[in-house]
Every structure is written in C-alpha cells, then in structure tokens.
C-alpha cells in the first residue's frame, strides 16, 4: 500500500480492496472485494486520539430495534438513523449491547461515524457484587468467546475505534482475561 489518506469521522476516506484466490495453476478461483480504511486510535496521556489528533466523543447508544418491525431493522432504517445522527452532530455510536448487522458498520465507515463496538456480554442482575459472573472463573471462556467473535468479525472496519467488552458485567477475572485477549490482538 502506498500513501493513503487516513480515515476519520471528518474525512471518511475509503479504498477499494480486491482479493483474488488462485489455484496451483494460477487460475483465479474466487474474487472478494471490500471497502477499507486506514487509521490509528489510542489513548495517550488520558486523551482519546484518532490518527494522533484528540477526539471529543459526541455519542449515542443504538439498539438494533424498530418500533414497527421489532428486531428487524431494514437498511433504509439504518440509513435514516445515520442521517439523524449526523444532522444532530453526533460523531460516535455505541452498539448497545451486542455487535450490529455488518451493514451498520459499512454505513459508519462510509458516512464517518466512530463506533464503540460492544460484545454481547451482559449480566445486569448480578452487576458488581460477589456473585458477579465476571468474577467466576467458570465463565472466562464464554466472555472471551464473545469478545473474540466480535473482534474477529469486525476488525477491518475503520470506524471502530473502541472495543467494549460488554455492558454492566461487573469486574473480575473474566473481564480481565477478555481484556488481555483483545489487547493482545489489537494493541
């Protein structure tokens, strides 16, 4: 890859990528295309930065839900949601409380919305007490499995600047191990 323009919410620069799979004879047997972007995100000296520049989060939570169709959210509704967010100067959306349909990330990449991608780890009833699932070693595998599925599926969307390990899970060994796993993959 040569010189590229970095992706950001202000300038969502995307590039076309094409992958060609060839057999042993050199014949193309499969072609896959995708839009990709290039950016960095980090927390440095207590400040979130994208491409080395400070970012102020102006965000909302979004559930994949429609008042008329329930958990089925059409592409048209997703596009309407994006437009409403942009019209209201929103620059970040959290996928509450589970990873969203991949089309949502494609829209965020295209229109320039930062994403906090949230794994479907949740344990409201147990929260932060001694009985929290996050403190029970028997649940480490489940926490890590859900986080890994999210990261592996969504790792190539430049709009994702933060991985959320879950919602109201409490703290404990399960969250610590999931954090280490995600950090080892995307540091």
Each language-model region and where it sits:
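Aromatic- and acidic-residue-enriched carbohydrate-binding clefts of CAZyme catalytic domains
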Residues: 58-63, 71, 118-155
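Secreted/periplasmic carbohydrate-active enzymes, especially glycoside hydrolases
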Residues: 1-107, 111-115, 146, 161-162, ...
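Solvent-exposed loop/turn segments at secondary-structure junctions
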Residues: 99-101, 121-123, 167-171
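Conserved short-loop catalytic and cofactor-binding motifs
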Residues: 66, 96, 131, 135, ...
């Amino acid at each position: 890859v040569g010189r590229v323009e970095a992706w950001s919410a202000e300038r969502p620069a995307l590039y076309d990528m094409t992958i060609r799979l060839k057999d042993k004879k050199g014949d193309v047997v499969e072609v896959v295309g995708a839009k990709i972007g290039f950016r960095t995100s980090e927390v440095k000296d207590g400040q979130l930065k994208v491409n080395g520049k400070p970012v102020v989060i102006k965000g909302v939570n979004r559930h994949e839900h429609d008042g008329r169709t329930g958990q089925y959210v059409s592409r048209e509704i997703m596009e309407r949601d994006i437009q409403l967010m942009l019209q209201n100067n929103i620059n970040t959306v959290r996928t509450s409380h589970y990873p969203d349909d991949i089309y949502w990330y494609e829209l965020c990449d295209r229109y320039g919305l930062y994403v906090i991608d949230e794994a479907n780890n949740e344990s409201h009833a147990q929260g932060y007490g001694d009985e929290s699932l996050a403190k029970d070693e028997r649940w480490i595998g489940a926490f890590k499995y859900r986080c890994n599925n999210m990261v592996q599926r969504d790792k190539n969307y430049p709009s994702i600047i933060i991985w959320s390990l879950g919602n109201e899970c409490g703290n404990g060994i399960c969250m610590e191990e999931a954090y280490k796993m995600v950090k080892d993959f995307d540091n």
